[in-house]
Structures are given as structure tokens and as C-alpha cells.
Amino acid sequence: MKFIRAELHNHSTESDGALSVESLAAYAAKKNFGVLALTDHNTTSGHAKAYDAIRRAGYALALLPGVEITTFFGHILALGLVQMPDITTLDPRAPEPFFAMLRTAGARAVGIAHPFSVGSPLFIGWRF
């Protein structure tokens, strides 16, 4: 079995992160990560920049596209998404259609972004 270092929850300056996507990719490569998930809040705008930065620099780093989506039920990580789905038409009290939409949009893994930041009903929105 081969061990691959992966960082699966990262924000860049495309949302509330401190590093640009280029700097984030450089940092992950320097720390010998094999996989970097870019999961900015409610946007996939940094994915193309990150792919380009990784390619141009020749990093041995795979980019896993994703997004951290803010919902009434909390912050949800959706890995594998290349585009942010339009969730504005969904009933905020019904999570099942939301998760079905993520599957249809290409999410391969979905999870709670901050499992220990419990609020009401499960979490409450943005906290930064």
C-alpha cells in the first residue's frame, strides 16, 4: 500500500483564505503533498488558476476540485465538484434535494466541513 499525503479542506484568496491558489499549490508541493483539494467557500473560481499553477511549476501534485457550500444546515464539503451548483432554488429546510443535486453535479465525497462547530439546527452559516 502506498501512502499519499493529502490535504482535503483548503481555502484560497478566492474566498476567505490567506494564500493565493498559486501560493497554496507551492506550499502543498513544498510540504510533499500528493493531493490538494481546493474547497473555497461557495466558489470554484480558483480551480483553473490552481491547475495552471501546478502545471506551469511542474509540481507532482494532483488537484482535487471541490467547494465548501454554506447552507442552513452548515458548511458542507463537496469534493469532486468542478462547478458550484445553483442551490438558490432549493428548500433550505430539506437537505435531501441538496445532496441529490451535489451527486448529480459530480460530487464524489460529501461531508461536514466543521463537525465540532455545532449550532442550531446543525450549524449556522458563515463565522469568519
Where are the language model's segments positioned?
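A metal-dependent hydrolase metal-coordination microenvironment
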Residues: 1-109, 113, 119-128
